[in-house]
Amino acid sequence: VGRSPTAEQEDMHAAVEQAHAAGVAACLPGRAAVTIDAAARLVLRERGLEDRFTHGLGHGVGLEIHEAPAVSSRATGTIQANMTITVEPGVYLPGQGGVRIEDTLVVADAGPRALTTGGTGLRVVGL
């Protein structure tokens, strides 16, 4: 943001971080992709930000970066063990910017395993 974040920006980041955690936790074999999206979307709805989340939660990753299954509010597929998917909730304010937190996961019986992680917490860097 080019300066210290405002309280609104910090709240927006915290909401997206919580939505990300909910989406990751929901990534279990046999789970409907729409249910995974709904877990993250519920967090944003409770924070009054659902209308600012304008895309699906994620997608499969394989030979191409964007593959099936879609993980969205319109998804029809089911997540299976050993699938590689992204979880990437975001909230955007027109003319101001937004926050997106994205990780790539392998779906496993014991729970999702992160292949990437941006870490947690808001990091403010100087310009």
Give the location of each predicted region.
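Active-site neighborhoods and metal-handling regions in enzymes and metal-associated proteins
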Residues: 1-127
